Amino acid sequence: MCIRDSSEVTDWDDDEEVASIYYGEMTSLAKDLSGCSHALMEGHINRNPEQALMHPDYAPIQFVHSDFTETYGKAICDYYESDEDSPRNALKRANLGPDAVRNSARILILQFWRNVGEPQMDLPLALCDAESVSRAELQDFHVASYAGGDFGFDTFGVKAPDTNDRHRWFAFPKMTSDEVLMLRTYDSERAASGKPFWTPHSAFQDPNVPAGNPARKSIEVRATCLF
């Protein structure tokens, strides 16, 4: 889903400004879109050449994946009950206790992706219709550490389809910073009923843009929506 949505952030490289302004903006958007009671927002990822030099995990991901498997429900509950500062701060901002996630009737993860660089970049993002990808086409693998962190999780790789027209792909060319993509990456309710909760996605090389000229600059945040 592509949404027209502006932000008051003026410097996307300023982590403090992003945390103080953008987290609140995206929390409100997540609640409006989902109807959830609470939305926890903690951490963000800037994907740009400078960040990629610091850790390769911050480069645009050029293979088809969906972030989380069925095991993410337990992992995110454990995470918010940990002693780490980031989840504790997110709970504090929402005036919630550490058991709030585990005691929720439903957990929904919404990811928000925003282009903060040139409208036509070298590695834009493409999304695949979840209904066109079966569970049998998803391959689980474990990420023990992402960008040097200590939060491990299981993720989906997506197998190539039998025919080129099976998976339905969408891209949103020339996005500006006044637009945001929303994708669902986990839903405990849909997972429990065997319905697709994944959204396969990947960066891809725009054949009309030379590599790095201009390079992609984007920001991602993830909302843990509680019902």
Regions found by a protein language model. Name each.
Residues M1-D5:
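Conserved small/polar residues in nucleotide/adenosyl-binding loops
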Residues Y23-P87:
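Long, hydrophobic, well-ordered secondary-structure blocks that form the structural core
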Residues S86-L123, S132-R135, F141:
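Internal, well-folded beta-alpha domain core
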Residues G43-I45, Q111-V116, D129-E131, A223-C225:
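Short, structured patches in soluble enzyme cores that scaffold and shape functional sites
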Residues Q120-V180:
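Double-stranded beta-helix
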